[in-house]
């Protein structure tokens, strides 16, 4: 089952629990707008290269649409559509005044020079500039993009619309980025984990973690969890996977990964098969890389008691059912990894106000939002006698449905 089919399935299950009528259900499911553009750029050697870019704007009932732009060879319409829909429910779960969107370009950024990436980003922005905006659709970084990409988008957009720092989030600090944004998704994973463990009378200290992915989300989550006394026993990234039952020294691993562009060769742990990271003996598993990695092939072998979804859609529906029967508690992506979009909201607010918050305020507000979000999620679980995933979906969908109905759109 691909990401879009799985997301639609979860939507329909939640819709049934909420008792939505068919007209409203259809209104919520169909994207507001789907954009597909061709982007041709001159390469450094003088040849021309063409790429296809996408932007799916899913829903704006609760506010401007919000979502990342990813650069990856496998970017395709169904995946972008699914991720845009998930952003709609995620922003609603977080209770921030946004809808959902997602975008991407089918390219391998590792095969393009910095100047080629800049040209590609600027051409893509030229094609979509009149369809995004501060109060319309606010992009952010995602896989294969980062603050520099956002700086190029801001600069190109500003040529058409004047200086508009709030048109993108995840920017460099010198262009209006927010303090604390870089760590926000990983910090949100920490706060989400603390909220779940507290519900079960536990703390992070002494818990054994396996983390799949050591990019922005996984590395920050690992550092912050380690700082709280959590023991990181296994980590993987695109270069390999490592394990140390006594706990990995995360600060040393961060230094190694920065110097060697990955964790491969780290001498403070043993190398293991990257595919085994998800089934390592641990208390808490944090998938923080690609989607669809937990499936029926490996779900029965998972030993973790808790799964915190740092990635988008890491667990497919078949695995969900298997893990539920095993008693594994899954904290779903649309809550667990919402720290990034929440601090993006803080950045947007700061840009509109023209006033910068200090990092302590950013982190304090993020904890407030994540703690409240878990409380709201649990209340929906109790109301509908459902698991955490359906609790999150019913929470998000219900909030969007209410806004849609009040506007008079769903009738």
From Swiss-Prot:
Catalytic activity: L-glutamate + NAD(+) + H2O = 2-oxoglutarate + NH4(+) + NADH + H(+); L-glutamate + NADP(+) + H2O = 2-oxoglutarate + NH4(+) + NADPH + H(+)
Pfam families per the UniProt record, alphabetical: ELFV_dehydrog, ELFV_dehydrog_N
One GO CC term, this protein: cytosol
Top class in the EC scheme: oxidoreductase
A GO MF label: glutamate dehydrogenase (NADP+) activity
EC number: 1.4.1.3
GO BP annotations listed: amino acid metabolic process
Residues of the active site: 102
InterPro entries from the UniProt entry: Aminoacid_DH-like_N_sf, Glu/Leu/Phe/Val/Trp_DH, Glu/Leu/Phe/Val/Trp_DH_C, Glu/Leu/Phe/Val/Trp_DH_dimer, Glu/Leu/Phe/Val_DH_AS, Glu_DH, NAD(P)-bd_dom_sf, NAD_bind_Glu_DH
Keyword tags: NAD, Oxidoreductase
Keyword NAD: yes
PANTHER family: GLUTAMATE DEHYDROGENASE, GLUTAMATE DEHYDROGENASE 3-RELATED
Similarity comment text for this entry: Belongs to the Glu/Leu/Phe/Val dehydrogenases family.
Protein name: Probable glutamate dehydrogenase 3
Organism: Arabidopsis thaliana
Gene encoding the protein: GSH3
């Amino acid at each position: 089952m691909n990401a879009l089919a799985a997301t639609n399935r979860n939507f329909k299950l939640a819709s049934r629990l909420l008792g939505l009528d068919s007209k409203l259900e259809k209104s919520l499911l169909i994207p507001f707008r789907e954009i597909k553009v061709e982007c041709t750029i001159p390469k450094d050697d003088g040849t021309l290269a063409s790429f296809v870019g996408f932007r799916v704007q899913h829903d704006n009932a609760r506010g401007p649409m919000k979502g990342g732009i990813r650069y990856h060879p496998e970017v395709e319409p169904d995946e972008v559509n699914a991720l845009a829909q998930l952003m709609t429910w995620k922003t609603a779960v977080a209770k921030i005044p946004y809808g959902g969107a997602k975008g991407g370009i089918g390219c391998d950024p590792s095969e393009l020079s910095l100047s080629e990436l800049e040209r590609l980003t600027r051409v893509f922005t030229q094609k979509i500039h009149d369809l995004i905006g501060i109060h319309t659709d606010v992009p952010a970084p995602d896989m294969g993009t980062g603050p520099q990409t956002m700086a190029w988008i801001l600069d190109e957009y500003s040529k058409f619309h004047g200086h508009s720092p709030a048109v993108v989030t995840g920017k460099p600090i010198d262009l209006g980025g927010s303090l604390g944004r870089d760590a926000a998704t990983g910090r949100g994973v920490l706060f989400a984990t603390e909220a779940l463990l507290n519900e079960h009378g536990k703390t992070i200290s002494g818990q054994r973690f396996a983390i799949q992915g050591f990019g922005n989300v996984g590395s920050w989550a690992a550092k912050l969890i380690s700082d709280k006394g959590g023991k990181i026993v296994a980590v993987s990234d695109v270069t390999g996977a490592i394990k140390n039952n006594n706990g990995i020294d995360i600060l040393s691993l961060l230094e190694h990964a920065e110097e060697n562009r990955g964790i491969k060769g780290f001498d403070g742990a043993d190398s293991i098969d990257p595919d085994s990271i998800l089934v390592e003996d641990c208390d808490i598993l944090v998938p923080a890389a690609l989607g669809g990695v937990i499936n029926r092939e490996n779900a029965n072998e998972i030993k973790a008691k808790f799964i915190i979804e740092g990635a988008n859609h890491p667990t497919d529906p078949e695995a969900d059912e298997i893990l539920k029967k095993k008693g594994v508690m899954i904290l779903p992506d649309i809550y667990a990894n919402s720290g990034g979009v929440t601090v993006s909201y803080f950045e947007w607010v700061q840009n509109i106000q023209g006033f910068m918050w200090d990092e302590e305020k950013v982190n304090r507000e993020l904890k407030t939002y994540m703690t409240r979000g878990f409380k709201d999620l649990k209340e929906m679980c109790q109301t509908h006698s459902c698991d955490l995933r359906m609790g999150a979906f019913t929470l998000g969908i219900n909030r969007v449905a209410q806004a849609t109905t009040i506007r008079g759109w769903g009738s």
